[in-house]
Amino acid sequence: MRKVMKPMKDVGIVGYGAYVPMYRIRNEEIGRVWGVSSFPIEEKAVPGLDEDAITIGIEAARNALKRAKIDPQKIRAIWFGTESKPYAVKPSATIIAEAIGATPDLEAADFEFACKAGTEALQAAIGFVGSGMAEYAMAIGADTAQGRPGDHLEFTAGAGGAAFIVGEKSNESVAYFEGSYSYVTDTPDFWRRQHEHYPRHGNRFTGEPAYFHHIINAAKTLMEELGLKPSDFDYAVFHQPNVKFPLTVAKILGIPKEKVLPGLLTGRIGNTYSGATMVGVSAVLDIAKPGDRILWVSFGSGAGSNAFSIVVQDAIEEKRDLAPKVEDYVKRRKVIDYALYAKARRKYIL
C-alpha cells in the first residue's frame, strides 16, 4: 500500500504570508512573577487588546494574496486551523473570507487538531485543488495560545499565524509539493474540556510518546516513500513547542541544526500552535533559493503529524518581496510587563 499522498494534479504554493503581533513579554518577566529562574525561550509574542486568531488570520491572508497576485474571488475554499477561535459556535473562516473579498462563491470552515490544525487545512486544500474541484484554495493556521498562570506553558504560549494559497503547479508557484504523509494515533497528551479556560497536559508524557513518536515516524515514512534522505533537504521545519524539541528531532534524523535554525522562531515569538510550522516555513521561503528542498513536519496533540516535502521554484525571487517578511514582524516589537500582558490576555477572570 502506498502511504505517501499525491494529488491527481501537481499542486504548488502560489502565495504565502505570515503575521506576528507586536507586543512581547520576556520569560524573565514571567519568571519574576512566579519565582522561576530557568526559561525555555527568550520571549513570546502577545496579541493586543484588539487582536485575536481571526485578525491574525486576516493579516496573514492579505499578505498571501499580495504574493499570489490573484483575484480573491478565484479562491474557492478558505480553511482556518486554530485551537483559539473567538467563537465557540460561529465559523471564523467566513469572517476571514469576507475581510479579504473572497465571498460568496467558496467553501469555508474551521479546522481543529491542536497545533496541526493549520497543516490539516493545508492537506485538504492540496486535495481540493489537486482533484480539479478548485483553481485556488487557502489554508490558514493561527493561534493566540493560552497557558494557565504559573504553568510552564505560560512561558511559551505565543501568538501568530500564516496563510498559504495553493493552486495547480505552474511558473507562478513559489514552491510545489512532492508529496505528503500523515501519521495519527489516539494519544491524550494535551487537552482542554469545554468551558475550561486553560488546557491541561501530561507533562513529560507530551514528549516521547507524543511529539517525538509522531514527528519522527511521519518524517521517516515520507522520506522512505519518496526515496529521499535527510541530506537531500536544504531546510527542515518541525513543530516547535520550544527550542529543544525540534533540534532533538533533527539530531535523531541526522539533519544538521543549521538547516533547522532559519525556521525555528519559538525562542523569539513563542509557540504559535497552529501557526508554528506555517510561520517557520514562511520564514524559510523568505530566504530560500530556487531548487531548495524543504522538509516540513507539524505535530498536533491528541495526536498526529503531517509531513510535506516541498521544492522551491524560480517565482520565489520575484514574489517574496511583495509582502512583509517574517523577520520584519519578529523585529517589530514592544516589550510589556506582566500586568499589561495579563490584561491583554484577559487572565484576570472575574
UniProtKB/Swiss-Prot annotation:
Domain of life, source organism: Archaea
Catalytic site positions: E83, C115, H239
Any single biological process term in GO: isopentenyl diphosphate biosynthetic process, mevalonate pathway
Keyword Transferase: yes
GO molecular function: acetyl-CoA C-acetyltransferase activity; hydroxymethylglutaryl-CoA synthase activity
EC numbers on record: 2.3.3.10
Residues the entry annotates as binding (3S)-3-hydroxy-3-methylglutaryl-CoA: C115, T156, T206, H239, N271, S301
Record keyword Nucleotidyltransferase present: no
Binding site for CoA: R204, K244
Top-level EC class: transferase
Keyword line: Acyltransferase, Isoprene biosynthesis, Transferase
Pathway: Metabolic intermediate biosynthesis; (R)-mevalonate biosynthesis; (R)-mevalonate from acetyl-CoA: step 2/3
InterPro entries in the record: ACP_syn_III_C, HMG_CoA_Synthase, Thiolase-like
Coiled coil feature spans: none
Catalytic activity: acetoacetyl-CoA + acetyl-CoA + H2O = (3S)-3-hydroxy-3-methylglutaryl-CoA + CoA + H(+)
Gene3D superfamilies in UniProt: 3.40.47.10
Family as reported in the entry's similarity comment: Belongs to the thiolase-like superfamily. Archaeal HMG-CoA synthase family.
Subunit structure: Interacts with acetoacetyl-CoA thiolase that catalyzes the precedent step in the pathway and with a DUF35 protein. The acetoacetyl-CoA thiolase/HMG-CoA synthase complex channels the intermediate via a fused CoA-binding site, which allows for efficient coupling of the endergonic thiolase reaction with the exergonic HMGCS reaction.
Function: Catalyzes the condensation of acetyl-CoA with acetoacetyl-CoA to form 3-hydroxy-3-methylglutaryl-CoA (HMG-CoA). Functions in the mevalonate (MVA) pathway leading to isopentenyl diphosphate (IPP), a key precursor for the biosynthesis of isoprenoid compounds that are building blocks of archaeal membrane lipids.
HAMAP family found in the cross-reference section: HMG_CoA_synth_arch (MF_01409)
Name this polypeptide is given: Hydroxymethylglutaryl-CoA synthase
Native source organism of the sequence: Pyrococcus furiosus (strain ATCC 43587 / DSM 3638 / JCM 8422 / Vc1)
